[in-house]
Amino acid sequence: MSYTADSLKAELNARGWRLTPQREKILTIFQNLPEGEHLSAEELHHRLEEEREKISLSTVYRSVKLMSRMGILRELELAEGHKHYELQQASPHHHHHVVCVQCNRTIEFKNDSILKQSLKQCEKEGFQLIDCQLTVTTICPEAIRMGWPSTLPSNWACTRSISLA
């Protein structure tokens, strides 16, 4: 769904929440992001400060969490274990991310076979697919040229796996 201030207000009211000026401003920032750009709560807070908005970091965190739970924002786990957010798309807009663990450069890619295989596995196990995200951790060419280590930082570990065979 593409949210406007009015549709967001209706959605929030239906769930017992209010459309505060802070939430409206946060929605506006996400609506104006170029496609493929994601923001962490800290990056969002920095943008709000640049626009002279007086919104505390804790309010930003609470707002993005709420909007994520409501399906307005999509929560992504990208580089360094930080959560990033993007506006949820109306139609199935499954895409995946390649992330450099050294400089956090992120690119998006689409691969319908990943989604199809995920759906197949979910059906087999009796699960209902809600979202499909793949984050490929890499070292980008620029980081390699700069001589950054080509190993994962010690705080990185593959914590989830599923066999799609």
UniProtKB/Swiss-Prot annotation:
Entry's localization field: Cytoplasm
InterPro entries named among the record's database cross-references: FUR, Fur_C, WH-like_DNA-bd_sf, WH_DNA-bd_sf
A Pfam family it matches: FUR
Keyword list, A-Z: Cytoplasm, DNA-binding, Iron, Metal-binding, Repressor, Transcription, Transcription regulation, Zinc
Region described as DNA-binding: spans on this chain: 1-91
Region of interest called Dimerization, as start-end residue ranges on this chain: 92-165
Sites where the protein binds Fe cation: H94, H96
Domain of life: Bacteria
Sample GO molecular function, one term: zinc ion binding
Family: Belongs to the Fur family.
Described purpose of this protein according to its UniProt entry: Acts as a global negative controlling element, employing Fe(2+) as a cofactor to bind the operator of the repressed genes.
Name assigned to this protein: Ferric uptake regulation protein
